[in-house]
């Protein structure tokens, strides 16, 4: 049986036993802060077992995708460690118990999987003789039953439900280990007796102090590893040698001269074992990365995003060890991974995220090599590399420790391991004491802060003169600094990233020098920490000024989120819950559960409702009240009540007569200031969860519609060309020929009309521009053509970008409209991906913006070195 057949067989079997089949849920937990990832089949059903929610049935079964990264170093080394896996489960909540669970298990392994009865073994808790006798009643011999102790066969985690468990093992034979049943009896790790199914009998309630009372409602919780079952049925030495992994491994082989050899499990060639491990690590890690990104997570320096970044970078390094020189490369594995699993998502979007992360890491590799080469050239007589610098390379730059070691060994230089471990321990200790939301990296010096000291005044004020209470770099508190600093002020108007709203931007000024606010986040006490770069002294006050345009954008989209949430509940019912939101100055996203994807008609209803709220011109109120009062006015509790330190002083954002929401963000004074509202997309984020993206304000929506129009025109041009090139060369019967001929002629007529309309539109746009297209000269940079003009008016920059792009489709067109503090800039091309160009240059210049493949627009502070960079350092990629 292949993996797809086994998964289907499990679900079909339990459906035939009247189990409700629970669809696989997102890897990202919903309203469960105790989990970083969904890590088991039962993790998505916790609310049913706790009684918080009513289950759809007393009997349930699933095949749940899961992530565990606590044993990442074992992946690729052992036969069965994975970061991503599927857990098959069957569950009973107050329904059947031991007898039925054991009968179902017996029937499935013998009649469905067709496993050899004589090769099955079962462990059970030594006091649980009922379970032992139930296995015997199924025809198994006593010598196939192994008693276990509390450590091996009693499931208990602190207080709460607990009970004995029984495990099913399969003996794969002497070729995997000549030692016999003693392996299982003594709980020795081995590759012969493989656990395939664990059945937990939730029987008692523990008080955590060794006292147990029997539960009124007894439950069954089981887990069977799909990868393990597949390896047994396919007689594969390891899980990696099955149809779940081999297609991915074979795809990797296309890019390297090295080969993965299954037979090496038995031959045990040391060099080949190492090579095999590289293939396994890449295949495993990229399964995790692809599925996590598909469920809505993205690589970053925080939380789940940090894990994805680490897995991608670890895979990237293993690709280097396989001498894979084509970079980026990992993103090319997305399609084969998707084909091996039953989950639906946009593989192109997932690949784009991975590719972007690979490009970013390739720059990190270059930076790390520069630092190492500099040390080697300046310290040619030294044979020991500072361990703290090696750790900084790893932690700050993400440069793999193994690569540092490899490069240095070529020069007979060793790393001071003692210093490395000390630096690592120091970092871990600081991380343990910090849980700041919105932090872009670990800042050890924040451990020096011991209490809440600041005051947020940003609801009432957007500027202030403030005193610096703490001036920090990453390690220490300072009296002055010239570089990256983290400030805590006595009072601040800057909102910190929280509640789905991005932080304020703006500047602080000291002694006539303005420093841009790069980030604002809260430490564990709730102090606002401001990140800036430049010269500062703790001895002088600072003038704070919030960027009012960005603040207004944030307010629009946060208020727009509340109004859209209200509209969604009006259209779909009060069962709609907010599962997540993200608001910045440009757009908003909102995650909510739906039975099926909302239709265009339903989305239009939501959009029109929000527009009606705008037209009502309703004032916003901030109300402070207790939780009971909040419930009386039907305030929507979009945040967990427990997150509020004082439930008697909840902050309610009230648009009277429309919606009242528990919220700590900044909002518009009146709904009319939203101006306009448009939902731009609805996409599936996970099973039963959809992400809605929307924008607000007339200017933003006009820009969006213009971009859409430009894209549509390009699509039409391509379609026209394709239709004109079509050869209608086929035979038809006489009766059909007249009708077909008429239809073909109609298509041709419409094509010609569309073609003329597009040409006229381009001609019309061309008349509006202020330069002569025939006088444009392209610059040749190593076979790549560039047109850069910084004397364009802001009003015509967008129109002109499109016209020049059509005239010179193989060139990169960069137009700039000069400004005092910053300049407007556009990138347009049919050959080069415009938004990727913008993103790449943003890594080297103070540049921000957005767009699409054929047109991207933004703003840039200093572009004086832009052309030089494009000539000397930029990697031109189609």
UniProtKB/Swiss-Prot annotation:
GO molecular function: alanine-tRNA ligase activity; aminoacyl-tRNA deacylase activity; ATP binding; tRNA binding; zinc ion binding
SUPFAM superfamilies, A to Z: Class II aaRS and biotin synthetases, Putative anticodon-binding domain of alanyl-tRNA synthetase (AlaRS), ThrRS/AlaRS common domain, Translation proteins
Residues that bind Zn(2+): 558, 562, 663, 667
Subcellular location: Cytoplasm
Catalytic activity: tRNA(Ala) + L-alanine + ATP = L-alanyl-tRNA(Ala) + AMP + diphosphate
Cofactor list: Zn(2+)
GO biological process: alanyl-tRNA aminoacylation
Keyword Disulfide bond assigned: no
Keywords: Aminoacyl-tRNA synthetase, ATP-binding, Cytoplasm, Ligase, Metal-binding, Nucleotide-binding, Protein biosynthesis, RNA-binding, tRNA-binding, Zinc
Enzyme class: ligase
The keyword Ion transport appears for this protein: no
Cellular component GO terms held in the UniProt record: cytosol
Top-level taxon in the UniProt lineage: Bacteria
Enzyme Commission no: 6.1.1.7
Cofactor note text: Binds 1 zinc ion per subunit.
Record note on domains: Consists of three domains; the N-terminal catalytic domain, the editing domain and the C-terminal C-Ala domain. The editing domain removes incorrectly charged amino acids, while the C-Ala domain, along with tRNA(Ala), serves as a bridge to cooperatively bring together the editing and aminoacylation centers thus stimulating deacylation of misacylated tRNAs.
HAMAP family assigned to the protein according to its UniProt record, in alphabetical order: Ala_tRNA_synth_B
Family named by the database record: Belongs to the class-II aminoacyl-tRNA synthetase family.
Classification via NCBIfam families: alaS (TIGR00344)
Entry function: Catalyzes the attachment of alanine to tRNA(Ala) in a two-step reaction: alanine is first activated by ATP to form Ala-AMP and then transferred to the acceptor end of tRNA(Ala). Also edits incorrectly charged Ser-tRNA(Ala) and Gly-tRNA(Ala) via its editing domain.
This protein's name: Alanine--tRNA ligase
Biological classification of the source: Bacteria, Bacillati, Mycoplasmatota, Mycoplasmoidales, Metamycoplasmataceae
């Amino acid at each position: 049986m292949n993996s797809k057949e086994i998964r289907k067989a499990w679900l079909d079997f339990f459906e035939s036993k009247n189990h409700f089949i629970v669809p696989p849920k997102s890897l990202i937990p919903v309203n469960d802060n105790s989990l970083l990832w969904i890590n088991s089949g039962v993790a998505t059903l916790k609310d049913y077992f706790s009684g918080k929610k009513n289950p759809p049935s007393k009997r349930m079964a699933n095949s749940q995708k899961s992530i565990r990264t606590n044993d990442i170093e074992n992946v690729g080394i052992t036969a069965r460690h994975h970061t991503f896996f599927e857990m098959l489960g069957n569950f009973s909540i107050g329904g059947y118990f031991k007898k039925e669970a054991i009968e179902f298990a017996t029937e499935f392994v013998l009649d469905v999987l067709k496993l050899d009865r004589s090769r099955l073994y079962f462990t059970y808790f030594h006091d649980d003789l009922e379970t032992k006798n139930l296995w015997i009643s199924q025809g198994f011999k006593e010598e196939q039953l192994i008693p276990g102790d509390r450590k091996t066969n009693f499931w208990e985690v602190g207080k709460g439900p607990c009970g004995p468990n029984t495990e099913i093992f399969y003996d794969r034979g002497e070729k995997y280990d000549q030692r016999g049943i003693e392996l299982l009896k003594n709980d020795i790790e081995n590759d012969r007796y493989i656990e395939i199914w664990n059945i937990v009998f939730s029987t008692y309630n523990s008080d955590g102090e060794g006292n147990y009372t029997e539960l009124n409602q007894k439950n069954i919780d089981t887990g069977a590893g799909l990868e393990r079952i597949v390896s047994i049925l396919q007689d594969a030495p390891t899980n990696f040698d099955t149809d779940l992994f081999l297609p991915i491994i074979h795809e990797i082989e296309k890019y390297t001269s090295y080969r993965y050899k299954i037979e090496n499990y038995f031959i045990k060639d040391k060099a080949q074992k190492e090579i095999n491990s590289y293939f396994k690590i890449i295949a495993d890690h990229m399964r995790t990365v692809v599925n996590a990104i598909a469920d809505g997570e993205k690589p970053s320096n925080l939380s789940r995003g940090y894990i994805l970044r680490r897995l991608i970078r670890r895979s990237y390094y293993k690709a280097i060890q396989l001498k894979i020189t084509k970079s980026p490369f990992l993103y090319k594995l997305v399609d084969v991974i998707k084909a091996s699993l039953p989950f639906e998502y946009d593989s192109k979007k997932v690949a784009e995220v991975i590719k972007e992360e690979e490009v970013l890491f390739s720059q990190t590799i270059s930076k790390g090599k520069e630092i190492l080469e500099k040390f080697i050239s300046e310290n040619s007589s030294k044979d020991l590399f500072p361990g703290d610098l090696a750790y900084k390379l790893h932690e700050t730059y993400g440069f793999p420790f193994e690569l540092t070691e490899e490069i240095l060994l070529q020069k007979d230089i060793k790393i001071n391991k003692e210093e490395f471990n000390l630096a690592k321990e120091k970092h871990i200790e600081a991380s343990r004491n910090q849980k700041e939301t919105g932090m872009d990296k670990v800042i050890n010096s924040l451990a020096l802060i011991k209490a809440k000291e600041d005051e947020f005044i940003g609801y009432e004020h957007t500027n202030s003169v403030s005193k610096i209470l703490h001036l920090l770099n990453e390690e220490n508190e300072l009296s002055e600094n010239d570089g990256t600093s983290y400030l805590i002020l006595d009072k601040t108007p800057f909102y910190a990233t929280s509640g789905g709203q991005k932080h304020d931007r703006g500047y602080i000024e000291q002694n006539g020098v303005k420093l841009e606010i790069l980030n604002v986040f809260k430490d564990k006490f709730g102090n606002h920490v401001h990140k800036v770069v430049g010269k500062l002294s703790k001895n002088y006050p600072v003038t704070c000024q919030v960027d009012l345009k960005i603040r207004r954008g944030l307010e629009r989209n946060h208020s727009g989120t509340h109004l859209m949430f209200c509209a969604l509940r009006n259209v779909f019912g009060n069962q709609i819950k907010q599962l997540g939101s993200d608001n910045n100055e440009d757009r908003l996203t909102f995650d909510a559960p739906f039975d099926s994807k909302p239709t265009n008609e339903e989305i239009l209803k939501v959009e029109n409702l929000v527009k009606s709220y705008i037209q009502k011109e309703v004032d916003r109120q901030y109300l402070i009240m207790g939780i009971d009062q909040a419930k009386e006015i039907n305030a929507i509790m979009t945040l967990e009540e427990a997150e509020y330190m004082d439930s008697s002083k909840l902050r309610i954002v009230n648009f009277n007569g429309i919606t009242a929401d528990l919220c700590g963000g900044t909002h518009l004074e009146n709904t009319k200031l939203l101006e306009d509202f448009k939902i731009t997309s609805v996409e599936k984020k996970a099973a039963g969860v959809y992400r809605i993206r929307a924008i607000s304000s007339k200017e933003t929506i006009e820009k969006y519609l213009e971009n859409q129009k430009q894209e549509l025109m390009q699509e039409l041009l391509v379609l026209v060309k394709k239709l004109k090139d079509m050869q209608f060369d086929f035979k038809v019967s006489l009766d059909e020929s007249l009708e077909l001929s008429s239809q073909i002629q109609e298509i041709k007529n419409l094509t010609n009309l569309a073609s003329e309309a597009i040409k006229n539109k381009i001609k019309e746009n061309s008349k509006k521009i202020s330069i002569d297209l025939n006088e444009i000269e392209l610059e040749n940079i190593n076979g790549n053509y560039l047109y850069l003009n910084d004397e364009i008016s802001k009003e015509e920059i967008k129109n002109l970008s499109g016209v020049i792009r059509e005239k010179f489709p193989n060139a990169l067109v960069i137009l700039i409209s000069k400004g005092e503090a910053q300049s407007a800039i556009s990138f347009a091309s049919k050959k080069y991906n415009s938004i990727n160009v913008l993103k790449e240059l943003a890594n080297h210049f103070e540049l921000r913006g957005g767009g699409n493949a054929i047109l991207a627009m933004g703003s840039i502070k200093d572009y004086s070195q832009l052309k030089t960079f494009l000539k000397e350092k930029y990697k031109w990629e189609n």
